[in-house]
């Protein structure tokens, strides 16, 4: 029986670290020369340190961020997809957007490519229009 960590286990550890807001644990899961891209923004983060720093900024804006993982789908030993719903509320100004506790609920899919037991590349797919609408037009009912 192999003691190697599976792609599904790495994905599960990643989302546990996200939900614990543990940026150091996230950085440890990524290879030093890795990349992460939020496809909706198109600006990649390069390297585990930059990925961790970007996530830290996200947690400043959304300190209550929580991911509800619906599925972890493993294609093979080096590729896995995670479907999730992210729920959070904006608590700090994000560029021109002032924080008024606007709630967001975003469904997304993150595709992870692994190499040697580390995340080499992650691509996160979610709808930017939904995100922007929720930040701009949220009401207390949402």
Task: Put a short name on every predicted segment.
Residues 1-142:
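C-terminal and inter-domain tail/linker signature
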């Amino acid at each position: 029986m192999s003691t190697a960590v599976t792609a599904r286990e790495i994905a599960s550890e990643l989302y546990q670290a996200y939900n614990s807001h543990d940026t150091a644990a996230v950085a440890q899961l990524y290879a030093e020369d890795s990349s992460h891209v939020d496809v909706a923004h198109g600006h990649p983060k390069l390297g585990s340190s930059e990925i961790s720093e970007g996530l830290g900024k996200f947690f400043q804006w959304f300190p209550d961020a929580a991911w509800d993982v619906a599925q972890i789908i493993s294609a093979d030993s080096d590729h896995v997809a995670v479907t999730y719903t992210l729920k959070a509320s904006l608590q700090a100004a994000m560029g021109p957007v002032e924080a008024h506790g606007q709630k967001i609920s975003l469904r997304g899919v993150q595709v992870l490519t692994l190499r040697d037991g580390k995340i080499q590349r992650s691509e996160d797919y979610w709808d930017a229009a939904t995100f922007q609408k929720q930040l701009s037009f949220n009401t207390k009912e949402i």
